[in-house]
Curated annotation (Swiss-Prot):
Record site feature (Important for catalytic activity), residues: 218
UniProt-recorded name of the protein: Purine nucleoside phosphorylase DeoD-type
Uppermost EC category: transferase
Pfam families (alphabetical): PNP_UDP_1
Disulfide bond annotation, renumbered to this chain: none
Gene behind this protein: deoD
């Protein structure tokens, strides 16, 4: 049944949903990678589509920016639409010298400066981790397709424009491979509701080198990430 934020019919979604942050990217994925895509939501302009990838039913829906927005949509998808598996397909920054622009990074866990997981976890630190089965299949698929991927810990931040030099040094020291604004929240909601989640991202910004993929080049740069994510769904 429709929720406060998703006005789709009960069986409109697949049990596997790819979730970019940007609704325009959700539309792009549906129109360029799925067969027979049907738009199933446009409430608050959070576009959602269901179609088929190699005869497997797949949905794609945007989750917006930040943990609160992403957590809200993930929760409603799992509780009201029986979604079992979430793959975040998005962008992230990096600070590691061995990781380059357009590289694919997979988050096996995510630390955060947000308080939301502490609120959920009775003011204790929660280890927000990806589902192992999904990591395994994504890594195996990447090897089979000869895609170079980096797997490690993310840092999910509430503050997009705050770049403390001291904090960046700490993140680099602890081998954080990706910085985003959603993964820690998505992993916590999925764990709480007994679902599976994984973030597969493309590096769009190297924060220390101050280098970035241009807005014009972003869609074409993310082909491998989207293909890897879709091929992974075939094993789930």
């Amino acid at each position: 049944m429709p929720t406060l934020h998703i006005k789709s019919e009960k069986n409109a979604f697949s049990n596997i949903v790819l979730m970019p942050g940007d609704p325009v990217r959700a539309k792009y994925i549906a129109e360029n990678y799925l067969a027979n895509p049907v738009q199933i939501n446009d409430t608050r302009l959070m576009l959602a589509y269901t179609g088929y990838y190699k005869n497997k039913k797949i949905s794609v829906m945007s989750h917006g920016m930040g943990i609160p927005s992403a957590s809200l949509y993930v929760r409603e998808l799992i509780l009201e639409y029986n979604v079992k598996k979430i793959i975040r397909v998005g962008t992230c920054g990096t600070i590691q010298n061995n990781i380059k622009l357009r590289d694919i990074v997979i988050s096996m866990g995510a630390s955060t400066d947000s308080k939301i997981n502490r609120i959920r976890f009775n003011n204790h630190d929660y280890a927000a981790i990806a589902d192992f089965e999904m990591i395994f299949h994504a890594f195996s698929t990447a090897k089979k397709m000869n895609f170079k991927v980096h797997i490690g810990n993310f840092f999910t931040t509430d503050s997009f424009y705050t770049e403390s030099e001291d904090m960046l040094k700490i993140l680099k020291k602890y081998n954080i491979i990706g910085i985003d604004m959603e993964t820690a929240g998505i992993y916590a909601v999925a764990a709480e509701l007994k679902a599976q989640a994984l973030s597969i991202c493309t590096v769009s910004d190297h924060i220390i080198k101050k280098d970035a993929v241009s807005s014009k080049d972003r869609e074409s740069s993310f082909h491998n990430m989207i293909t890897l994510s879709l091929e992974t769904t075939l094993l789930l």
